[in-house]
Amino acid sequence: MKENVLDVLMYLFENYIDEDTEIEPDRIQLQDKLLEAGFPGAEIDRAFDWLENLANQEDQPLGQARHDSALRVYTDREVERLDARARGFLLFLEQNGVLDAGTRELVIDRIMDLDAEDISLDQLKWVTLMVLFNRPDQEAAYTWLESMMFDSPPEFLH
């Protein structure tokens, strides 16, 4: 089983993150369950580090105003990791008010912190969903993206 950090994060998000859960399992319990599920210990540790970094960034105000006319220029490294469809998806979310500039930057930061060479559109959606879930006052944006991901029929390219 060749699992990466994003696979661990997606598994955690699908199985253990529930807005209605009152008792959250601790890190050791989760690590044990992830090991039982077959994830490598190193990837589990990196996934928890990724989540801690996300939580630490959540505590810091982003402090930037939205400029509708501003254009985000991606670095070469970001372009390697995020293809045109992924960058277009981020722009789509921002233009539709799902992401503001600060949250977009947080999504990009979390993507760049993963060890993957390139990120698929589905993986980007998952990371965006995780970021929105952890942002205060983003419940509507989270719900919108979640329903788009799970309630819409799959895209078929012909």
Curated annotation (Swiss-Prot):
InterPro entries: Smg. It comes from Thioalkalivibrio sulfidiphilus (strain HL-EbGR7). Belongs to the Smg family. Signal peptide: none annotated. It holds the Pfam family DUF494. This is Protein Smg homolog.
